[in-house]
Structure formats: C-alpha cells, structure tokens
From Swiss-Prot:
The keyword Kinase does not apply. Glycans are attached at residue 154. Pfam families: V-set (PF07686). Belongs to the CD300 family. The gene is CD300E. It is found in: Cell membrane. This is CMRF35-like molecule 2. Interacts with TYROBP. N-glycosylated. Probably acts as an activating receptor. The keyword Transmembrane applies. One of its GO terms (molecular function) is transmembrane signaling receptor activity.
Length: 205
C-alpha cells in the first residue's frame, strides 16, 4: 500500500521543483525563448530540453554542461542562469514542424528506471504562420507641362502648339480648329480684295 503514495510524492516533488510557462506561441521565421524556473537545490545540475509526448521517453535536444554559457544544437540553444534560478531555451528560425510537446528537465540521476525520474515540466509550443503584407505598387507621377516663351519674340499659333508637349499638330483637335478657322480666313481675304479692287470710271468722264 505504500507504493502508490511514494510514487505520488515523487511525482509531486519533481513537478513542484521545476516550472515552465506551460505553453508558448511563436511566429514562423522568428525566434522563441522559453524560461524554466527551478529551486536553489538544483543550481549545480545540468539542465536540458527534450521533445516528446512523455517526459520519460522524450528525445534530448540540447543540454547545459554545468557552466553559465550558451550551449547550441542547430537552431536550438540553452543557457543556465543560476543567479535567477532559471534556464532559458531559445529556438531560432521557427517553422511549423517545431510545434509540439517539449519538456524542461533537470538531470538528477544518470540511470533512469521505473523508480527514478528527473524533475520535468511540460511545455507546449505553438507556431503560427508568418504574416505577409501585400506589396504596394506605385506609379510615377506625370511630369507637369511648361510653356516657355521668349519675352523678346512673338510666337505664332503654330509655334505655341508645337512647344506644348501635350498637343500635337496631327491631333484631331488641331485639325478641327484648322477646318473651322479656314473659311473665316478665306472670307476675310475675299473682303480685303473686294475693298481694294481697282475703281474703273466710265469713258467720257
């Protein structure tokens, strides 16, 4: 009858001596840092980060070497902070395959069996898709049209129209103006010739 209380006490002691965030969420392409808090009695022990459904069979990814320096394995690094009674795990360049169950663990025994286990705490990692922003297409502004006139020179109508880059002599608007003005010009020329015609006096006067 003493076996069940002993196992329960062992489990509770391991769970209470180490505490992680429970769950964390990162974005694909970014980095994610997990803090795992522990009691002062575990300052000198190695800490490690493993992945799996169960803490007794999870696969170790990276672990400390008893020193306060960063240990790295691929995109995952770990560092112990004894002064803060915590160790941190950083996962860089996240992708959707990194989502799953992980464990903060402290190595207290070298040979694990059914009677002994390392303190551990489950951390569920979620990875959300990267946020992409649509590219904005910009169009160049239309340059303004300037009409440069020499003050010492009078430009004819044809020259003014030619210097305006927005108006062409072959455009329909120009042809329409010419067709409308041509009869008026011909009428004016006819009137001038009529007024200036020679006056012939009848013979005998």
């Amino acid at each position: 009858m003493w076996l069940l209380p002993a196992l329960l006490l062992l489990c509770l002691s391991g769970c209470l001596s180490l505490k992680g965030p429970g769950s964390v969420t990162g974005t694909a392409g970014d980095s994610l840092t997990v803090w795992c808090q522990y009691e002062s009695m575990y300052k000198g022990y190695n800490k490690y980060w493993c992945r799996g459904q169960y803490d007794t069979s999870c696969e170790s990814i990276v672990e400390t070497k008893g020193e306060e320096k960063v240990e790295r394995n691929g995109r995952v690094s770990i560092r112990d902070h004894p002064e803060a009674l915590a160790f941190t795990v950083t996962m860089q360049n996240l992708n959707e395959d990194d989502a799953g169950s992980y464990w903060c663990k402290i190595q207290t025994v070298w040979v694990l069996d059914s009677w002994s286990r390392d303190p551990s705490d489950l951390v569920r990692v979620y990875v959300s898709p990267a946020i992409t922003t649509p590219r904005r297409t910009t169009h160049p502004a239309t340059p303004p049209i300037f009409l440069v006139v020499n003050p010492g020179r009078n430009l004819s109508t044809g020259e003014v129209l030619t210097q305006n880059s927005g108006f062409r002599l072959s455009s329909p608007h120009f042809l329409l103006v010419v067709l409308l003005k041509l009869p008026l010009l011909l009428s004016m020329l006819g009137a001038v010739f009529w007024v200036n015609r020679p006056q012939w006096a009848p013979p005998g006067r």
